[in-house]
UniProtKB/Swiss-Prot annotation:
This is Cell division protein ZapA. Keywords: Cell cycle, Cell division, Coiled coil, Cytoplasm, Septation. GO terms for cellular component: cell division site; cell septum; cytosol. Homodimer. Interacts with FtsZ. It comes from Pseudomonas aeruginosa (strain ATCC 15692 / DSM 22644 / CIP 104116 / JCM 14847 / LMG 12228 / 1C / PRS 101 / PAO1). The keyword Transit peptide does not apply. PANTHER family: CELL DIVISION PROTEIN ZAPA. Residues 66-94 form a coiled coil. Signal peptide: none annotated.
Length: 104
């Protein structure tokens, strides 16, 4: 089992100490850098004032992107499953009727 250690990350000029298993350290550091970048991007636009509001906007933007990608992957997965079913049906028909295999 992984041992937990405290990791200090800096997000929008503030330090946060987070308890994190060793095997998740790199992922957490990467997530913190990503969040910091998104929050700085929003803050630099000048349209959102206050760290709390910047954090909420960053969370909404990241969540929107995540859900959009998940939806796209779900559609691609569904399309791939359908294509595999079609190919399996063709194989089954070809095996059932070897004389007709060249016509499909």
């Amino acid at each position: 089992m992984s041992q937990s250690n405290t990791l200090t990350v800096q997000i929008l000029d503030k330090e946060y100490c987070i308890n994190c298993p060793d095997d998740e350290r790199a992922n957490l550091e990467s997530a913190a850098r990503y969040l910091d970048g998104k929050m700085r991007e929003i803050r630099s636009s000048g349209k959102v004032i206050g760290a709390d509001r910047v954090a909420v906007m960053a969370a909404l933007n990241i969540t929107h992107d995540l859900l959009h990608r998940k939806e796209r992957l779900d559609q691609e997965s569904s399309s791939t499953r359908e294509r595999v079913r079609e190919l399996l049906d063709r194989v089954d028909r070809a095996l059932a009727n070897p004389a007709d295999a060249g016509e499909a």
